[in-house]
């Protein structure tokens, strides 16, 4: 019987592959770290589970392999099953039903038998600990099952002939690696996803061909970099896109063996600097060889410059065409990333090159690359847009349609030509002015190109005294909105950006509005208006910055920290204009009322001082006797007035404000907030050394101010000289330093006399920063917050009163309705009672008495006397 069982088992033997160790092969890194970055895939082990019955599969140790070839295991031939013991049912001498068998060698099986074979649900355990739980079909694992290895690795899914086949999930026990997808003959085959870490940040999802990535797939690396495209032999091969999120780069194109090869596009996304005019994106479109820019290609620089020509190993080599950002073009030979011919030139084209972009590229490339600043006279020319009718070319287009409509049709062409000539003659000066004002209040930019905002434009108009022509800045905004179709909500917005061509259009429109009456009978009128504006306003006064906001770079950076909140306050207290387009505006009267509501008008900041501050930059506000409170203020005038107010009441009011705050708040919250502002401005300042000095000496200022905050009110005045003295003493006791080259040289206290003027300047700046913070945060913003809370409280009270009034009205209506119902019920009740009374009157006659006529009264009297007489007789 045992021999027959052996034969049956031998017939049912099937071969199976033992589990093999599979690693995610690392891919070769590219040679060029700039244009051809290669993400190295983390290697991991994914054992392939195989299920022999007669012999325990050899489970290879899980290890990180660096080779691309996987260790392959031959399918072992099943040995004979020799049953040493059996516990269970038998039918006609064959195992049947549930039973437990122990085989020779230590393997065991517990489960269902049929006709002497393992058939149905069961658990087979090899002597080395490998276990299979699932379905058996005639001694063969089939359909669905779970494999568990001694190290904890598991596979659960479909099984065919003892091998993983179909859909299943594998989890490695020694490493956080898992695979879920399709299998074929024990190997990953078809669609599947593999995860290389427990967090799920490193994974591959796509096509597999017998444990090899082949076809289309997405690979996400632990660093966050992502590749999406075609694969071949576990490497990027074919068309695909790689995104390096860590360096903000992207390549889309052809790959060969994990490296860029063929035609593609590589883009460098760079962080945009605030107020920068360009999107700051460098892009190369062309041919690659082994990860290098090699062959024909175009390189677009972030500033607008562009190179088109031949490349060799990431360098411009051979014939090419370089278009600089100022519009000039060099076309000729390049050698080793430089223009081939060198000579002297009057124009300094080093400013024209996008040095920032080249520096960015040099930092990323294995070998340096730069573009020379020289040119060849025969091949350098200006892009003047010969196909354009404008003398300014295609780079600058003036929108003169509405202005020319003011002139007769026959003279419009001449007016346009003459004014374009006038702009062309002054274009260099106007570009310089635009660049100067657009950079006010901005940090140093790598490409030195900024966008002008309305705030800069207002400062330009006031510096050039446009408002001296009996027109306010608010009026100018409305004029420009008519010509340019600006939305109502953005007419007076300080953050609206202005391009160079828009800046030129604004100047022409304002020139016409200011001087058109003077030259209306002369031709060319628009030319004369613009020329007079240039000669009387722009040339003499441009770039001579006045006011309190942009006068000093360091203070401007500090002041910009409060501009957003001040804009919120400004818009909150604006009122609709009485004339079209009915936009929100701020009049001087509203401004003064706002300060009064904030309780800031006192002996330090009087109404007279308020008027004097506003009139500093506007002669039409106050002439010493009469004041005009109806003048409108744009946000620049509003904000600069606040800055001036912070200087007017700089010490007395600030000290009192400090005394109103608990000492703990002074030493913690206020200092922390001020320090934050200092640190923010330090990062934005062009000189890190200067900012660092300010940060160091600010601590001494804080300690002195804290001492003031702890003093009683009566000792404040006496402590003011001590404050200044203590500040100086702190600086003597503290470590002094000065800049030498790029480093810091620490000095002894004896060197103070050499640094005294510099320290005094820093001390003034630090005190100004503290006072500025206290004025805006502790005084202005706190008062605004209090007013807003009061307004909200008033609104809440009004809503509550309205709700109560409505509720009372509803209650009164309900009460009135109830009274009406009661009245109606009472009336119905009375009517009902009346009806009952009427009905009761005829029904009072007894129904039992016969309806006979009553005897007359005389008869009744005789009857009574007759009844009484016998009694009398009896008594007698």
Swiss-Prot record:
InterPro entries assigned: MORN (IPR003409)
Residue ranges annotated as compositionally biased, kind Low complexity, are 39-50
Tissue expression per record:
Expressed in ependymal cells (at protein level).
Cellular compartment(s): Cytoplasm, Cytoskeleton, Cilium axoneme; Cell projection, Cilium; Cell projection, Cilium, Flagellum
User: Does Cytoplasm appear among the keywords?
Assistant: yes
Name any one Pfam family assigned in the record.
MORN
Regions of biased composition (Polar residues) lie at 17-37, 356-372
Any idea which UniProt keywords this protein has?
A: Cell projection, Cilium, Coiled coil, Cytoplasm, Cytoskeleton, Flagellum, Repeat
Q: Where are the MORN repeats?
A: 86-108, 109-129, 132-154, 155-172, 179-196, 204-225, 227-244, 251-268, 284-305, 307-328
Q: What is the protein's major site of localization?
A: cytoplasm
Q: Which residues form a coiled coil?
A: 790-832
Where do the record's region annotations for Disordered lie?
Answer: 1-71, 356-386, 839-876
Q: How does it assemble?
A: Interacts with RSPH6A. Does not appear to be part of the axonemal radial spoke complexes 1 or 2.
Biological role stated in the UniProt entry: May function as part of the axonemal radial spoke complex 3 (RS3). Radial spoke complexes are important for ciliary motility.
The name of this protein is: Radial spoke head 10 homolog B
| Source organism (scientific name) | Mus musculus (Mouse)
Write the lineage as a comma-separated list: Eukaryota, Metazoa, Chordata, Craniata, Vertebrata
This protein's encoding gene: Rsph10b
């Amino acid at each position: 019987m045992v021999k027959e069982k052996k034969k049956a088992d031998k017939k049912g033997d099937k071969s199976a592959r033992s589990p093999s160790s599979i690693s995610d092969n690392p891919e070769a890194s590219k040679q060029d770290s700039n244009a051809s970055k290669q993400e190295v895939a983390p290697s991991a082990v994914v054992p392939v589970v195989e299920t022999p019955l007669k012999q325990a599969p050899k489970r290879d140790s899980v290890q990180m392999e660096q080779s691309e070839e996987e260790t392959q295991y031959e399918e072992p031939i099943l040995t004979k099953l020799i049953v040493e013991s059996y516990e269970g049912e038998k039918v006609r001498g064959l195992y049947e039903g549930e039973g437990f068998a122990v085989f020779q060698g230590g393997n065991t099986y517990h489960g269902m038998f049929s006709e002497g074979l393992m058939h149905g649900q069961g658990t087979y355990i090899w002597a080395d600990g490998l276990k299979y739980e699932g379905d058996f079909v005639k001694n063969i694992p089939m359909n669905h099952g779970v494999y568990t290895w001694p190290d904890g690795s598991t596979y659960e899914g479909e099984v065919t002939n003892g091998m993983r086949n179909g859909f299943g999930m594998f989890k490695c026990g020694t490493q956080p690696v898992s695979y879920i997808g399709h299998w074929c003959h024990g190997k990953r085959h078809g669609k599947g996803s593999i995860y290389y870490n427990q967090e799920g940040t490193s994974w591959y999802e796509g096509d597999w061909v017998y444990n090899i990535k082949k076809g289309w797939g997405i690979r996400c690396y632990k660093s966050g970099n992502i590749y999406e495209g075609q694969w071949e032999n576990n490497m990027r091969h074919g068309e695909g896109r790689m995104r390096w999120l860590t360096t903000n780069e992207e390549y889309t194109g052809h790959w060969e063996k994990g490296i860029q090869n063929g035609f593609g596009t590589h883009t460098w996304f760079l962080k945009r600097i605030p107020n920068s005019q360009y999107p700051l994106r460098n892009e190369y479109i062309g041919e690659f060889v082994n990860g290098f820019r090699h062959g024909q290609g175009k390189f677009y620089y972030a500033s607008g410059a562009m190179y088109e020509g031949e490349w060799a190993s990431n360098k411009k080599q051979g014939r090419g065409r370089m278009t600089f950002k100022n519009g000039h073009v060099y076309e000729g030979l390049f050698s080793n990333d430089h223009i081939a011919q060198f000579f002297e030139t009057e124009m300094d084209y080093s400013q024209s090159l996008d040095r920032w972009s080249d520096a960015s590229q040099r930092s990323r490339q294995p070998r340096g690359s730069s573009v020379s600043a020289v040119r060849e006279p025969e091949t350098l020319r200006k892009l003047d847009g010969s196909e354009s009718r404008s003398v300014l070319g295609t780079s600058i287009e003036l929108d003169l349609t509405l202005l020319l409509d003011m002139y007769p049709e026959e003279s419009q062409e001449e007016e346009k030509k003459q004014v374009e000539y006038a702009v062309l003659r002054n274009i260099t000066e106007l570009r310089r002015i635009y660049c100067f004002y657009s950079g006010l209040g901005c940090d140093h930019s790598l490409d030195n190109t900024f966008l002008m905002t309305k705030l800069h434009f207002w400062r330009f108009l006031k510096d050039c005294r446009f408002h001296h022509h009996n027109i306010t800045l608010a009026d100018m905004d409305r004029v420009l909105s008519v010509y340019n179709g600006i939305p109502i909500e953005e007419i007076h917005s300080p953050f609206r950006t202005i391009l160079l061509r828009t800046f030129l259009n604004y100047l022409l429109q304002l020139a016409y509005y200011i001087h058109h009456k003077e030259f209306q009978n002369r031709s060319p009128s628009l030319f004369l208006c613009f020329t007079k504006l240039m000669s009387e306003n722009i040339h003499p006064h441009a770039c001579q910055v006045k006011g309190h906001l942009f006068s000093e770079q360091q203070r401007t950076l500090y002041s910009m920290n409060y501009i957003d909140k001040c804009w919120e306050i400004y818009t909150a207290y604006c009122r609709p204009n009485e004339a079209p387009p009915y936009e929100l505006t701020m009049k001087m009267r509203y401004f003064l009322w706002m300060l009064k509501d904030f309780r800031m008008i006192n002996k330090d900041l009087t109404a007279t001082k308020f008027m004097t501050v506003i009139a500093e930059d506007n002669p039409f506000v106050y002439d010493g006797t009469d004041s005009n409170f109806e003048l409108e203020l744009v946000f620049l005038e509003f904000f600069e007035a606040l800055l001036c107010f912070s200087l007017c009441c700089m010490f007395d009011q600030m000290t009192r404000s400090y005394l109103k705050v608990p000492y703990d708040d002074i030493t913690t919250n206020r200092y922390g907030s001020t320090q934050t502002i200092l640190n923010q401005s330090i990062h934005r300042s062009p000189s890190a050394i200067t900012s660092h000095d300010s940060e160091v000496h600010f601590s001494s200022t804080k300690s002195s101010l804290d001492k003031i905050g702890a003093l009683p009110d009566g000792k404040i005045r006496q402590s003011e000289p001590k404050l200044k003295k203590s500040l100086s003493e702190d600086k003597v006791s503290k470590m002094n330093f000065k800049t030498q080259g790029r480093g810091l040289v620490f000095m002894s206290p004896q060197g103070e006399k050499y640094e005294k003027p510099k320290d005094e300047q820093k001390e003034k700046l630090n005190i100004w920063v503290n006072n500025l913070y206290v004025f805006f945060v502790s005084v202005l913003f706190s008062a605004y917050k209090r007013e807003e809370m009061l307004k909200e409280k008033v609104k809440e009270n009004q809503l509550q009163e309205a709700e109560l009034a409505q509720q009372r009205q509803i209650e009164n209506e309900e009460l009135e309705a109830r009274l009406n119902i009661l009245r109606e019920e009472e009336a119905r009740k009375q009517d009902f009672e009346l009806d009952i009374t009427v009905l009761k009157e005829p029904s009072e006659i007894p129904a039992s008495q016969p309806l006979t006529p009553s005897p007359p009264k005389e008869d009744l009297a005789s009857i009574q006397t007759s009844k009484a007489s016998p009694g009398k007789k009896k008594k007698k």
